[in-house]
UniProtKB/Swiss-Prot annotation:
Keywords annotated in UniProt: G-protein coupled receptor, Glycoprotein, Membrane, Receptor, Transducer, Transmembrane, Transmembrane helix
Bias (Basic and acidic residues): 312-323
Name of this chain's protein: Mas-related G-protein coupled receptor member B4
All ranges on the Extracellular side of the membrane: 1-34, 85-98, 169-180, 246-255
Tissue specificity of this protein: Expressed strongly in newborn dorsal root ganglia, adult dorsal root ganglia and trigeminal ganlia.
Protein source organism: Rattus norvegicus
Taxonomic classification: Eukaryota, Metazoa, Chordata, Craniata, Vertebrata
Gene Ontology cellular-component terms listed: plasma membrane
Location within or outside the cell: Membrane
Record InterPro entries: GPCR_Rhodpsn, GPCR_Rhodpsn_7TM, MRGPCRFAMILY
Disulfide bonds: none
Gene: Mrgprb4
Residues the record marks as carrying a glycan: 11
């Protein structure tokens, strides 16, 4: 064997070893991220199931808790689908429903996005026009809005699944782009509503002569919105917006934003119970139901942790409406 041939053989062997080492490293990273996604999703499913159980069967529902209930439902279904999807990727068993799971993920992501925007917008309306809100707002507005958001999210995800070949048809480039454009425009509109309403609510709290007192419910809303922006929004940008600018991202990046989206869905129940436990009496029994009620408490507290006596806004509005 000539020196040139021997050198080429050695170099070729080194290249192959480096290639297989790199592939093995990628597979290990991919599987590790998917296992983390599964663990976070299981924890999140337990938390959201607890919220669903308490709000659905053990607590009196109001205009805002209806949105929280639907948000917990969207997060629970999203985490369920993501768990199955990640296990299919790692274990590589029957993937006949692989693309169907993508449609379910899009459906619940869109629904959850809408619920967060609805919570912020409704709260903004209640403090900006309190008399109209308490006197003229239809009684079943929250349930109606949630039903419309679920229906529109389902329709949009089915159109995307059908046009992009996720369901029962072949990939149609033109129709897929058209549906993706509608979904992207819808997400931008919902995000602008969320952004403007959150800023208006923040301005009402910290600015002006008629500043509203900070309650636990405002803290809950603020943390929920912030967590969604930092953890839940990136996957929406990657899936719906980046294809329009023809930006190709690595599979590792997509796994990371998927992990962040699971953290977002898992974090909401933790936020509720954390806010409910702030300044809690140590001698008082801390049940999950009580913590959830306190997280949605809309009256400020005095130093002792009790509700402020001056906050009877809802009662005053009822009297004003009836007079």
């Amino acid at each position: 064997m000539s020196p040139t041939t021997q050198a080429w053989s050695i170099n070729n062997t080194v290249v192959k070893e480096n290639y297989y080492t790199e592939i093995l490293s990628c597979i290990t990273t991919f599987n590790t991220l998917n296992f983390l996604i599964v663990i976070i999703s299981v924890v999140g499913m337990a938390g959201n199931a607890t919220v669903l159980w308490l709000l659905g069967f053990h607590m009196h529902r109001n205009a805002f808790s209806v949105y929280v209930l639907n948000l917990a439902g969207a997060d629970f279904l999203y985490l369920c689908a993501q768990t199955v999807y990640s296990l299919e990727c790692v274990l590589q068993f029957d993937n006949s429903y692989f693309y169907f799971l993508l449609t379910i993920l899009m459906f619940n992501y869109l629904a959850g996005f809408c619920m967060i925007a609805a919570i912020s917008t409704e709260r903004c309306l209640s403090v900006t026009w309190p008399i109209w809100y308490h006197c003229q707002r239809p009684r079943h507005t929250s349930a109606t809005v949630c039903a419309l958001f679920w229906a529109f999210s389902l329709l949009l995800s089915l159109l995307l699944g059908q046009g992009c070949g996720f369901l029962f048809s072949k990939f149609d480039y033109s129709f897929c782009r058209y549906c993706n454009f509608i979904a992207t425009a819808f997400l931008i509109v919902i995000f602008m509503v969320l952004f403007v309403s959150s800023l208006a609510l923040l301005a009402k709290i910290i600015c002006g002569s008629h500043r509203i007192p900070v309650t636990r419910f405002y803290v809950t809303i603020a943390l929920t919105v912030l967590v969604f922006i930092f953890f839940g929004l990136p996957i929406g940008i990657c899936v719906f917006l980046l294809p329009w600018i023809h930006m190709m991202l690595s599979s590792f990046f997509y796994e990371m934003v998927t992990l962040l989206s699971c953290v977002n869905s898992c974090a909401n129940p933790i936020i509720y119970f954390f806010v409910g436990s702030i300044r809690h009496h140590r001698l008082q029994r801390q049940t999950l139901k009580l913590l959830l009620q306190r997280a949605m408490q809309d009256t400020p507290e005095e130093e002792g942790g009790e509700r402020g006596p001056s906050q009877k806004s809802e009662d005053l509005e009822v009297v004003r409406c009836s007079s």
